[in-house]
């Protein structure tokens, strides 16, 4: 079968790889000059199935109000002038109940754990290298309230059989030796030894090369204008003056997926803006060895070979990609507070990207009411974590195979009755 994939981020490239491995003739189209040059370019570097959880959670609305008045708050909201933004935020608030949180987290953990298994198999099969580390992730608590609150997360981890370690301040140095110098600032930590880290952009680039070796064609620097419709099906992709035709089409355009298919159906995928800095290591002994998550500022600090990536923040501001100096200041403050002298933040590169977020946190993966149109989008902050599993799942669906995990509640159909501005799909 001929399959066209729109988007060459980590999710699109993973889809291409698994579809090609299943025997399909795959073409990937992207407006950028190469793979992983937008959202996948400089993310926090985590593969964290253990932390797969919705942002929409009980208590978040009150925290959001509090954060509005804090200098280094992890969340910011600025109206973008669209009705869609307001509707999306209302939907997110509706998902902040304990009942919906449990359902949504269950979906996310299921896909994230499956994706981890797919990644491990991929690594065993291909030997792909991406400055990866398997040292787990360590969530740091600065207050007793945060430490006490971890009990709820631990209960969820136990229910999902996810290995964990609850560490005292004195024990943190066993996971991250450099924290010995700042342990007096911390009340403890929650370590998930099964999580991994690495450079997502490097991973995506090398996975694209593996996909090319399987026959996948990548068409970069190509405009993606519209989907051509005929007889209730997709007849092609309009790329400038050319129409690219296939048997099946996959939209993996991240935050841009919503507008691109708006004439067919309305999906609630909104851009959640994040920031990162990447600094050269100047003292390896003072740098992290894996990924550390600062619970107070919701910032991840990840070790690459000779670099430190510091990423976080969530801004609900539409498609604004302005680099704000205050955000860089927060990232530098956090890494220098926990790992002073480890990296040279004065030489750090500063980046921002738009994460495609759904109100319930779960991505949209699978079939649509249009028979030959498939979606693989809305992964939020967990795009790399869920990419391999989403790609394999999508390949199974397109190939007519039964997926290895439950997939019906990951599709767009869960949203077609209550997505902003829509009560039914354009093609039922």
UniProtKB/Swiss-Prot annotation:
Cofactor: FAD
Binding-site residues for FAD, renumbered to this chain: 3-17
Pfam families in the record: DAO (PF01266)
Pathway per the UniProt entry: Amino-acid degradation; D-alanine degradation; NH(3) and pyruvate from D-alanine: step 1/1
The reaction(s) this protein catalyses: a D-alpha-amino acid + A + H2O = a 2-oxocarboxylate + AH2 + NH4(+)
Function noted in UniProt: Oxidative deamination of D-amino acids.
Similarity comment: family membership: Belongs to the DadA oxidoreductase family.
Name of the protein: D-amino acid dehydrogenase
Organism listed in the record: Burkholderia cenocepacia (strain HI2424)
Gene: dadA
């Amino acid at each position: 079968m001929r399959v066209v994939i729109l988007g060459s981020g980590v999710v699109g490239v993973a889809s291409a790889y698994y579809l090609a491995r299943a025997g399909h003739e795959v073409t990937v189209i992207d407006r950028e000059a190469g793979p992983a040059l937008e959202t996948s370019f400089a993310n926090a570097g985590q593969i964290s199935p253990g932390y797969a959880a919705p942002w929409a959670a009980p208590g978040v609305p009150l925290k959001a109000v509090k954060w509005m008045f804090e200098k280094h708050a992890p969340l910011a909201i600025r109206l973008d002038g669209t009705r869609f933004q307001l509707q999306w935020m209302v939907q997110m608030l509706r998902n902040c109940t304990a009942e919906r949180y449990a359902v949504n987290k269950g979906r996310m953990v299921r896909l994230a754990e499956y994706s981890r298994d797919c990644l491990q198999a991929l690594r065993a099969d291909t030997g792909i290298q991406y400055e990866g580390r398997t040292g787990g992730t360590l969530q740091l608590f600065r207050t007793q309230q945060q430490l006490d609150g971890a009990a709820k997360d631990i209960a969820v981890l136990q229910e999902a059989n996810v290995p964990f370690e609850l560490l005292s301040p004195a024990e943190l140095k066993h996971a991250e030796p450099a924290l010995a110098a700042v342990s007096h600032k911390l009340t403890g930590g929650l370590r998930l030894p099964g999580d991994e880290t690495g450079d997502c952009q490097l991973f995506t680039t090398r996975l694209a090369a593996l996909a090319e070796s399987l026959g996948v064609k990548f068409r970069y620097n190509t405009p993606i204008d519209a989907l051509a419709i005929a007889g209730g099906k997709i007849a092609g992709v309009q790329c400038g003056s050319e129409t690219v035709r296939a048997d099946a089409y996959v939209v993996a355009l991240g935050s841009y997926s919503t507008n691109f298919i708006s004439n067919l159906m309305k999906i609630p995928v909104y851009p959640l803006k994040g920031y990162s800095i990447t600094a050269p290591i100047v003292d390896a002994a003072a740098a992290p060895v894996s990924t550390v998550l600062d619970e107070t500022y919701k910032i991840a600090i990840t070790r690459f070979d000779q670099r430190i990536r510091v990423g976080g923040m969530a801004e609900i501001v539409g498609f604004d990609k302005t680099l704000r100096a205050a955000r860089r200041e927060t990232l530098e403050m956090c890494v220098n507070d926990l790992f002073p002298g480890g990296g040279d933040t004065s030489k750090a590169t500063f980046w921002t990207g738009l994460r495609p977020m759904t109100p319930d946190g779960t991505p949209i993966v699978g079939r649509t009411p249009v028979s030959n149109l498939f979606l693989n989008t809305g992964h939020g902050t967990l795009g790399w974590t869920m990419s391999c599993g989403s790609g394999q799942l999508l390949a199974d669906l397109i190939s007519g195979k039964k997926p290895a995990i439950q997939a019906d509640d990951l599709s767009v159909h869960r949203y077609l009755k209550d997505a902003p501005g829509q009560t039914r799909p354009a093609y039922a």
